[in-house]
Amino acid sequence: MVGKLKQNLLLACLVISSVTVFYLGQHAMECHHRIEERSQPARLENPKATVRTGLDIKANKTFTYHKNMPLIFIGGVPRSGTTLMRAMLDAHPDIRCGEETRVIPRILALKQMWSRSSKEKIRLDEAGVTDEVLDSAMQAFLLEVIVKHGEPAPYLCNKDPFALKSLTYLARLFPNAKFLLMVRDGRASVHSMISRKVTIAGFDLNSYRDCLTKWNRAIETMYNQCMEVGYKKCMLVHYEQLVLHPERWMRTLLKFLHIPWNHSVLHHEEMIGKAGGVSLSKVERSTDQVIKPVNVGALSKWVGKIPPDVLQDMAVIAPMLAKLGYDPYANPPNYGKPDPKILENTRRVHKGEFQLPDFLKEKPQTEQVE
């Protein structure tokens, strides 16, 4: 009896020892694997999300991301066609932009604030938080947000309108990035933000004069930085010309980005809500507009809405209008003749053929752009 008890105890000890050795072995292998992973470039793996319409990519495809990847940044003053631009690019099977992150322009503005304050700069340097440390942290943060707020794709883009206020800084952080600066007649942009009640930090929506002054300041900042990085990195895209002649401009734009042409960019409205297509936010103000095909319905809505005294002083209030090619005294201006297909799209839009789908409907939107 005692012998049998000893035998059972010995067997139990042997089992416990075996389990312990197995567990320690597994734990050691996991630690080794994690160390190896940390030594490799950051990767995003999501087998389901890598399957995109029109892409011949296996479900286990891995996309690597790093500071030298060819990121695309879309920006401009809000209500200048940035959402339409990103929706058209999102329709391309190789490109993913996604909704506005909202955090990217805020963190960039914070970095600018630190840089402008000489006192803060000294304090940061004394603490060892040098420009190199901050730049490295900014690269990692921005990449993490851009990559992980949507599905993987060969080309990733970000659309946060005011991010391009830091265009030259972004160009330094990401040397292979390209920038699309959306430009629109400031009178149309301002009328859109006022009539649609799009709150923008610093803009007084009760005053056309104030909003046009702020529009001029914002677009001048972004335009100057676009010119500074040069035409090989930054492309001006006039909203009016994009909607009048979308194929011509999208071909030029994709050539600038070194991305193969795909006809789907001309039919973004057909890709909304589809896997690998165009993902829209329920709370962005432009959502109810980009569900429609490209049309010219919004080009001259501002005509007759701006106070006479503001119209009279337009060239002084907003000198960037003339610099960008707009006649400050033309009411309405002649933006050009649309392609036949765009005329047909506009007719269908006016008939009410395109309505907001149920999955995008929500409470009244209260968006603030910073």
UniProtKB/Swiss-Prot annotation:
Post-translational modification: N-glycosylated.
Site residues by UniProt (Transition state stabilizer): 159, 286
Catalytic activity annotation: L-tyrosyl-[protein] + 3'-phosphoadenylyl sulfate = O-sulfo-L-tyrosine-[protein] + adenosine 3',5'-bisphosphate + H(+)
Annotated active site: 100 (proton donor/acceptor)
Cytoplasmic side: 1-8
Gene3D superfamilies (alphabetical): P-loop containing nucleotide triphosphate hydrolases
Membrane topology (UniProt): Single-pass type II membrane protein
EC id: 2.8.2.20
Keyword Glycoprotein listed: yes
Pfam families (alphabetical): Sulfotransfer_3
Gene Ontology annotations for the cellular component aspect, listed alphabetically: Golgi apparatus; Golgi lumen; Golgi membrane; trans-Golgi network
Region Interaction with peptide substrate, residue ranges: 102-106
SUPFAM superfamilies in UniProt: P-loop containing nucleoside triphosphate hydrolases
First-listed, main subcellular location of the protein, grouped into a coarse class: Golgi
Disulfide bonds: 97-157, 226-234
Record-linked InterPro entries: P-loop_NTPase (IPR027417), TPST-like (IPR026634)
MF term (GO), any: protein-tyrosine sulfotransferase activity
Subcellular location: Golgi apparatus membrane
Ranges that cross the membrane: 9-25
Lumenal side: 26-370
Subunit structure of this chain's protein: Homodimer. Can also form heterodimers with TPST2.
UniProt record similarity statement: Belongs to the protein sulfotransferase family.
Function: Catalyzes the O-sulfation of tyrosine residues within acidic motifs of polypeptides, using 3'-phosphoadenylyl sulfate (PAPS) as cosubstrate.
UniProt name for this protein: Protein-tyrosine sulfotransferase 1
Taxonomic placement: Eukaryota, Metazoa, Chordata, Craniata, Vertebrata
Gene responsible for this protein: Tpst1
